[in-house]
Amino acid sequence: LFPYTTLFRSINHARLRYLDDITGSRVTTVMSNAANLAEEVTNADLVIGSVLIPGALAPKLVSEDLIRQMRPGSAFVDIAIDQGGCGETSRPTTHHDPTYLVHDVVHYCVSNMPGAVPRTSTYALTNVTLGYGLTIAQKGIDAAIEADPAVKKGINTYRGKLTYKAVAEAFGMEHSEI
C-alpha cells in the first residue's frame, strides 16, 4: 500500500501551494477546519500534530474525542509538545520512555525531539541561524534590525525590554516595540 498524506492548509497558502507543486499527487492539502480535521484524524493510522504560534502555547486541535475515534493501534505524534502540545491527551515524555496509550492509540510526545539526533539538529539549526548572527556581527544590532526585517522579527528582548508580544502575553508581562 502507498501512504496517503494530508496537510492542513493554514494561513500560509503560498507555502502549501508550493508543497502541492513539489509533491504532486503524493500529498493532499485541505483547508484547516473542524470537519476536515475530524475526517482525517479518525481515518488515519498516523497523525502528526505540528502546530506553532511563535511564543505562545499550541492550541489543542486534537481533542480526546478524536483520539477515542481513532483505530486501535494507530499513533499520534505531538511535535508541538514543547509548546504545550496540540492534543488534549498529550503529555511530555522522554527519549528513555517515549510512548504511552490513550484509548488504544499510541502517543509519542517526546520533549525536545531534535535531541535524539543532536549532531544533525545542531547542523540544521546552525544552517538557518548563522546568517542572522553574521549580519548582527557585521552591522551591529541596530543596523541589522533596520537592514533585515527577519532579524527584527526574531528579537525577543531589546535594551532590557520584552519585545515579543506573544511571549509577553503568555507571561502577563509588558510588551514594548523595538
Task: State where each predicted segment sits.
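Short, small-residue-biased leader/transition segments that mark boundaries at the very start
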Residues: 1-7
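Conserved acidic E/D residue at the C-terminus of a beta-strand in Rossmann-like folds
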Residues: 8-11, 31
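Residue-level "edge-of-site" marker
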Residues: 11-12, 54, 113
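Short alpha-helix immediately C-terminal to the canonical SAM-binding loop
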Residues: 16
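Rossmann-like adenosine-cofactor binding region
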Residues: 21-103
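Adenosine-phosphate binding glycine-rich loop
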Residues: 81, 86-178
